[in-house]
């Protein structure tokens, strides 16, 4: 007998939870109160931007729509290290150290983006 999971909302967290439940074999139902054009939670206001750490451009190739595009080889993607991400988060913490959850956010950020990409989340 499969488990039934109900997801309320259709933002990033909700859809990620739904995908994870599907991967575990659950039957998933998503309820969204908003009209389709207004759905997507706070993510709809980010223009798809999500912060994640990476050491170099090679780690980004699997995320690109067309990594063989000739412009890619001439692009310097730089890096956004975990240390830089942590420093940026500290700017929002009013002098408090990073929480356990923030540390997980940083350490799992690339892995999470890759996981979302593997499920065609755009």
Residue ranges with predicted function:
Residues 21:
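Aromatic pocket-lining residues of Rossmann-like dinucleotide-binding sites
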Residues 33-122:
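Conserved N-terminal/central alpha/beta ligand/cofactor-binding core
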């Amino acid at each position: 007998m499969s488990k039934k999971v109900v997801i309320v909302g259709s933002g990033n967290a909700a859809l990620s939870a739904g995908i994870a439940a599907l991967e575990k074999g659950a039957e998933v139902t998503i309820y969204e109160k908003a009209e389709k054009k207004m759905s997507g939670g706070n993510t709809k206001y980010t223009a798809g931007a999500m912060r994640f750490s990476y050491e170099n451009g090679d780690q980004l190739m699997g995320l690109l729509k067309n990594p063989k595009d000739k412009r890619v080889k001439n692009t310097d993607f730089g890096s956004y290290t975990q240390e830089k991400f942590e420093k940026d988060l500290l700017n929002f913490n009013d002098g408090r150290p990073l929480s356990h959850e923030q540390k997980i956010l940083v350490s799992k950020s690339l892995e999470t983006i890759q996981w979302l990409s593997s499920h065609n989340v755009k």
